[in-house]
Amino acid sequence: MRFLLLNRFTLLLLLLVSPTPVLQAPTNLTDSGLDQEPFLYLVGRKKLLDAQYKCYDRIQQLPPYEGEGPYCNRTWDGWMCWDDTPAGVMSYQHCPDYFPDFDPTEKVSKYCDENGEWFRHPDSNRTWSNYTLCNAFTPDKLHNAYVLYYLALVGHSMSIAALIASMGIFLFFKNLSCQRVTLHKNMFLTYILNSIIIIIHLVEVVPNGDLVRRDPMHIFHHNTYMWTMQWELSPPLPLSAHEGKMDPHDSEVISCKILHFFHQYMMACNYFWMLCEGIYLHTLIVMAVFTEDQRLRWYYLLGWGFPIVPTIIHAITRAVYYNDNCWLSTETHLLYIIHGPVMAALVVNFFFLLNIVRVLVTKMRQTHEAEAYMYLKAVKATMVLVPLLGIQFVVFPWRPSNKVLGKIYDYLMHSLIHFQGFFVATIYCFCNHEVQVTLKRQWAQFKIQWSHRWGRRRRPTNRVVSAPRAVAFAEPGGLPIYICHQEPRNPPVSNNEGEEGTEMIPMNVIQQDSSA
């Protein structure tokens, strides 16, 4: 059964592959020559030999044909196995996956004529199976591949822009600084680095036919959210046992593998920093009874340190057991070394959030109703992002066979994958009420300064600025929403003009007021 991966590479990876498969290697190949063959060429040839062996075994094991009338004998056509077929019947099978330019979702046909003989091609007068639909490089598929390719570039570019803007906001406005924002900034950094790596891959590796064609890769992930398919984005080149050889120690091959190594590492960091967000909220709300004094070094260790372990193990095992160029093939279970921990992090985070919601709902029904409500609002962003970022691992393991639904699936799946950084920045920063109020306040101050510069009448600063402060974190219903839970750094003064830290209304104010 084909390996189902989880790799958010992205991979939509429209690799430039257009090999013409060669079924038989020259007879004069030596063992040393075989070692230099493209790795995935050997994998495809092994699949073909396995299928041939199973076919001949099946031909021997099946009972004789018991139908009436003429029929075509079971046979091996060189690529696939065909059972006994009644005369006048067209048999169909899915295309094989031996070759990167074959589309396994398409069908192969073989016709048994009325005389009980397999159809012969008029040009060669030899029995013939129709593999023409297996071509993965049809104009429609190429067009779809180009669209997905540019969708990935746009998605990661927008993600980088949105994440850098969010990082700038959190760094510039000191009143937004707290432990949870520190977690946000680290998670933003992982998404920025991951998007940069993917863009480099799409720009430098994908168009590099000399590198990619030498070891054809399956492009779209056929794992929980991907499906294997090959696309060609440049003129075809043949692939044989001798053509397309590339020294595994070539600098391009090494650079490509290093790039993929860091992509896998950053992808894992994405999800483990999301887990840090969930652990932080769970500790803050469930374990510590609404206290925020937590040591962040353990979060740094989990978010940056732990993902390097499975990434290194994957790199070593991949180099030893499945050393294809760039390590992009999804036809190996070794990818579970990385994606297993990622799935575990998503599951743990999901249960953390369920427990957080349970605790908050209980508190809202009993005591601390206002504060519990505010924490529930603070948890809302993580509650949205965890299923959003993990949906491709859980909800979309199967691509619809219908062509229209399949295209809708492709665009939806790739939008979720390649715009993840944009979603993270939007939900954690741009949609946060506290950030919006801070930006509005800054804009109001800018307009005052601009008006004063041009000689307009300057209105009293305390009236313009303090008004937003008074309602800075208020939402309909009178309950604020916060990024942070922190104590004021100095007592507020009567004119509401203290240090910037006093603008952060602490979470426990409501509890103190209610107990007074």
UniProtKB/Swiss-Prot annotation:
<feature type="topological domain" description="Extracellular">
    <location>
        <begin position="318"/>
        <end position="333"/>
    </location>
</feature>
<dbReference type="GO" id="GO:0001669">
    <property type="term" value="C:acrosomal vesicle"/>
</dbReference>
<dbReference type="GO" id="GO:0007166">
    <property type="term" value="P:cell surface receptor signaling pathway"/>
</dbReference>
<feature type="topological domain" description="Cytoplasmic">
    <location>
        <begin position="432"/>
        <end position="516"/>
    </location>
</feature>
<keyword id="KW-0807">Transducer</keyword>
<dbReference type="GO" id="GO:0004948">
    <property type="term" value="F:calcitonin receptor activity"/>
</dbReference>
<dbReference type="GO" id="GO:0070374">
    <property type="term" value="P:positive regulation of ERK1 and ERK2 cascade"/>
</dbReference>
<feature type="transmembrane region" description="Helical; Name=3">
    <location>
        <begin position="257"/>
        <end position="279"/>
    </location>
</feature>
<feature type="glycosylation site" description="N-linked (GlcNAc...) asparagine">
    <location>
        <position position="73"/>
    </location>
</feature>
<dbReference type="InterPro" id="IPR001879">
    <property type="entry name" value="GPCR_2_extracellular_dom"/>
</dbReference>
<feature type="disulfide bond">
    <location>
        <begin position="256"/>
        <end position="326"/>
    </location>
</feature>
<keyword id="KW-1133">Transmembrane helix</keyword>
<feature type="glycosylation site" description="N-linked (GlcNAc...) asparagine">
    <location>
        <position position="130"/>
    </location>
</feature>
<dbReference type="GO" id="GO:1903131">
    <property type="term" value="P:mononuclear cell differentiation"/>
</dbReference>
<feature type="disulfide bond">
    <location>
        <begin position="72"/>
        <end position="112"/>
    </location>
</feature>
<dbReference type="InterPro" id="IPR001688">
    <property type="entry name" value="GPCR_2_calcitonin_rcpt"/>
</dbReference>
<dbReference type="GO" id="GO:0150058">
    <property type="term" value="C:amylin receptor complex 3"/>
</dbReference>
<keyword id="KW-0732">Signal</keyword>
<dbReference type="GO" id="GO:0150060">
    <property type="term" value="P:amylin receptor 2 signaling pathway"/>
</dbReference>
<feature type="topological domain" description="Cytoplasmic">
    <location>
        <begin position="280"/>
        <end position="296"/>
    </location>
</feature>
<feature type="transmembrane region" description="Helical; Name=5">
    <location>
        <begin position="334"/>
        <end position="357"/>
    </location>
</feature>
<feature type="topological domain" description="Cytoplasmic">
    <location>
        <begin position="358"/>
        <end position="377"/>
    </location>
</feature>
<dbReference type="GO" id="GO:0007188">
    <property type="term" value="P:adenylate cyclase-modulating G protein-coupled receptor signaling pathway"/>
</dbReference>
<keyword id="KW-0297">G-protein coupled receptor</keyword>
<feature type="transmembrane region" description="Helical; Name=4">
    <location>
        <begin position="297"/>
        <end position="317"/>
    </location>
</feature>
<dbReference type="GO" id="GO:0051897">
    <property type="term" value="P:positive regulation of phosphatidylinositol 3-kinase/protein kinase B signal transduction"/>
</dbReference>
<feature type="topological domain" description="Extracellular">
    <location>
        <begin position="25"/>
        <end position="146"/>
    </location>
</feature>
<feature type="disulfide bond">
    <location>
        <begin position="55"/>
        <end position="81"/>
    </location>
</feature>
<comment type="similarity">
    <text>Belongs to the G-protein coupled receptor 2 family.</text>
</comment>
<keyword id="KW-1003">Cell membrane</keyword>
<protein>
    <recommendedName>
        <fullName>Calcitonin receptor</fullName>
    </recommendedName>
</protein>
<dbReference type="GO" id="GO:0001503">
    <property type="term" value="P:ossification"/>
</dbReference>
<dbReference type="GO" id="GO:0051384">
    <property type="term" value="P:response to glucocorticoid"/>
</dbReference>
<feature type="transmembrane region" description="Helical; Name=7">
    <location>
        <begin position="405"/>
        <end position="431"/>
    </location>
</feature>
<feature type="topological domain" description="Extracellular">
    <location>
        <begin position="203"/>
        <end position="256"/>
    </location>
</feature>
<dbReference type="GO" id="GO:0097647">
    <property type="term" value="P:amylin receptor signaling pathway"/>
</dbReference>
<comment type="subunit">
    <text>Heterodimer of CALCR and RAMP1, RAMP2 or RAMP3; the receptor complexes function as AMYR1, AMYR2 and AMYR3 receptors, respectively, and respond to amylin/IAPP, calcitonin/CT and CGRP1 ligands. Interacts with GPRASP2.</text>
</comment>
<keyword id="KW-1015">Disulfide bond</keyword>
<dbReference type="GO" id="GO:0071356">
    <property type="term" value="P:cellular response to tumor necrosis factor"/>
</dbReference>
<dbReference type="GO" id="GO:0032841">
    <property type="term" value="F:calcitonin binding"/>
</dbReference>
<feature type="glycosylation site" description="N-linked (GlcNAc...) asparagine">
    <location>
        <position position="125"/>
    </location>
</feature>
<dbReference type="GO" id="GO:0071560">
    <property type="term" value="P:cellular response to transforming growth factor beta stimulus"/>
</dbReference>
